[in-house]
Amino acid sequence: MFMDYKYFFITIILISIFCGCYEKSYSFVEYNRHYELNEPNNTKNPNYDQNIFLNHDLPKTYPKMYKFPKNYYELSDKMFPDVKKRDLDTLSYILKTIKLPAYKKNYYDCSEASCQLEWILEGYGFKTYLVYGILDTYGNSGSHMWVAVQLDNGKMVLVESTYLCENYYCPDYAIIYKNYNLNNIVIVRDMKYIPKFYADTPDMFLIPHNNRRFLITQLDWWNHPKNAEIKKEMFNLK
């Protein structure tokens, strides 16, 4: 019953019905208090959230950013603790602690949501890719962006970032496919994800691929009012 409702969500996204959003800025405190922000209801151990994180960050080499802020990934590493294991259970748990701004076409849609989710998951230590392609559902098709996350066992999962937007919030079903290949078409019931190209960082989408290039305004999730505190840190604003 709920699965059919899930696919209704993605249809709504494609026809771009906006349900509105309350403009309250997310703060560093809200992000770092991940357990209190959106407490999962499926963890049996109340100390689970403390047990999945390392007590220190692993050393990292941050990608060089050309158009994006230079401290882009350094900031996410600072904000989010590294997980001990990058497995499906941990990823599922982390996704349940994330609530992104409301979806609105051409303002904060699949591209901004995917970029922000990729940034957050990289901060937690997950190897994450952004995938651009076509989403066909119920006979309607359109350009779309989603996230692919690589796990420690080498497998990859497809994550639908818009299911974490507050007006389409459905985190239990954000993981669409659990044995994903970046180059393969994925068909899940009436949804078909057709990849065109993928990238390690959103910065790479500003370079033309197959005659397609994104504008920075299509990816600048930090300009949403709810991300105002992050923007201040990212750009050293007072």
From Swiss-Prot:
* Protein name as catalogued: Uncharacterized protein MJ0834
**Superkingdom:** Archaea
State the InterPro entries in the record: Papain-like_cys_pep_sf (IPR038765)
